[in-house]
Every structure is written in C-alpha cells, then in structure tokens.
Amino acid sequence: MFWFDAVLLGVLEGLTEFLPVSSTGHLILLGAWLGHQSEAAKTLDIVIQLGAVLAVVVYFRERLSTTVRGMVRRDPDSLRLALALAFAFLPAAVVGLLFHKAIKAHLFGPGPVAAALIVGGFLMIGVESLRRRRPDQGAPRVEDVTFQRALAIGFAQCFSLWPGASRSMTTIVGGQLSGLSTAAAAEFSFLLAIPTLGAATVFDLVKNGRALLDAPGGIVALVVGLAVSFAVALLVIAVFLRYLKRYGLAPFGWYRIALGALVLWLWIASRSAPAEAGAASASPAPRGDVAAAVDGLARTGDHPSRP
C-alpha cells in the first residue's frame, strides 16, 4: 500500500461521500484501477470514511453541541432530533447486518453499480423536476423531522446498501419526499452520516482491522488517507450545501447517468473480449487500464463492503 494510493483514495472519499454520486461505487472502481486485491487495501477503502465523519462533526459542531446540551436539559426539539436520527439509523443497520453477505455476493460488481448509478440519476432528475414545479415549501428545520419522516428516510437509506445508489442521494431524496425542504433534508442527511458511517467503519475494523495494521505501511496509509479525506470532505460540505440551494440535484443526476453508462459499456466490452484474454484478466488489473479493472471486478466479485 503506497501512501500515494492513500492520498488518491482520501481525495475521492472526501469528494464523493457527501455528494449524491455514490462514494462506494467510485472507490470500487478506483481500487480496481489501482490493483487493490489485499484485505488491507480493501479495509482502507472503508476506514478512511472516518475522516469524512470527522468533517461532519467539525462542520456541524455548533448544531451538535446545542443538541447535546438540549438533551441534558430535556429540550423537546433536541430530544426529537436525537430520536429522529436514531429512528433513521436503525433500518439500514438491521438490513446491513442481516444481508451483508448476500449484498456483497450479488451487488458488488460493475453491472449492479452501473445500474444503481443510472436508476438513481433518473430518480434525482425526476424529484428535482417535481420540486421545481412546486416551490420548496417543505418543513424548513431538521427539528421538524417527525418519527414518521425519520423512518421514511431510514428505509430510503436501506437502498444505499446497493453499491452505486449513494447514501447521500437516498437520504436527501427520502427527506424531500417525506416533506422536508431541500436544505433540511441535506442537513439531516449529513447528521445521519455520523452514526451510519461510524457504525460501518467500526464493523469493518472489527472484522479486518488487523490486516490493515499488520500490512507494511498500513498505519501510514491510514493516517494519510484519514487526513486527506477529512480536509477534502470539510470543503465539500460547505460548497455542496450552497450549491444545492442554488442548483438542486439534477446536475448530479446527469453525472450519475453518464458515469453509469460508461461503466456499463466498459463492462460489456470487457466481457465480450476474446476468450483467450480470460486468464490474463483474472489477475489484478494494471494501473491505468480502466477496462481491465472493470472486468476484474466482474470476474472476482471481491470488493470493499459497507454494511
């Protein structure tokens, strides 16, 4: 594991974790392009999201501090927000634990990732079209997230277990459809990332953390990846919230459709290659050969997972 790989992964994680474009899908493709096959490398793909979680904590530190103090004082708004986050967290946590192996076996491949990117892109464009026809008049505050809305967002987040769907996309769209304003849906999505991504990272560390720590340069790669993902994610959060208010979700929808179509085309092209290339493609893909990387994903089915 080279530290430069950790920098690339950290930049990509920070850029895509909170954008509705699927960080998992992007990391799967970058990891294959870099030739990551070891358990340590794949664990790093998951663990560096702690940097993004820390960025949320820092960016929303005033909100979090106010909520914690309010819970101590039994402030109704603070208690409602904390319980809403817990309600929204539970569905994906339960589904992830129950179906983790099945999801990894059947959905972690270029075909499912491409399909999720394309379907999610059309969904975002459709929701954005509805929103533009009806001005954003949803509940304006995250404190307005009722338990019913929280459960709706939580069940929507379950679809993010499908690599390529995007946790950010499913929770923001779920919030909008449940009656929240775009701003409130986005803020709730960011806050929900703290328990969701934190739990996913702890789960993977417990299972595979030793492989990363024992790997040559593993600790250095972890520190570098965390630092880079934190710095990039902190910038992305601020820019994305302003961008979302002005332009909405549609541009990200078109990006998802274009990327999904490209991945699907590369995957189909690699699978239709001459049969004699099969033996070579079963080995780790060389750096820079994107088509071979996509084909390697299809053949091995061995990818980083997020429970």
Curated annotation (Swiss-Prot):
Zinc-finger among keywords: no
One term of GO molecular function: undecaprenyl-diphosphatase activity
Enzyme Commission code: 3.6.1.27
Predominant localisation class: membrane
A GO-annotated cellular component: plasma membrane
Cross-referenced InterPro entries: UppP
Alphabetic keyword roster: Antibiotic resistance, Cell inner membrane, Cell membrane, Cell shape, Cell wall biogenesis/degradation, Hydrolase, Membrane, Peptidoglycan synthesis, Transmembrane, Transmembrane helix
Membrane-crossing segments per the record: 40-60, 79-99, 107-127, 183-203, 219-239, 249-269
Membrane topology, record value: Multi-pass membrane protein
Gene Ontology biological process terms in this record: cell wall organization; peptidoglycan biosynthetic process; regulation of cell shape; response to antibiotic
Reactions catalysed according to its record: di-trans,octa-cis-undecaprenyl diphosphate + H2O = di-trans,octa-cis-undecaprenyl phosphate + phosphate + H(+)
Organism domain of life: Bacteria
Short name of any one Pfam family annotated for the protein: BacA
Localisation: Cell inner membrane
Family: Belongs to the UppP family.
Function field: Catalyzes the dephosphorylation of undecaprenyl diphosphate (UPP). Confers resistance to bacitracin.
Additional observations: Bacitracin is thought to be involved in the inhibition of peptidoglycan synthesis by sequestering undecaprenyl diphosphate, thereby reducing the pool of lipid carrier available.
Protein name (Swiss-Prot/TrEMBL): Undecaprenyl-diphosphatase
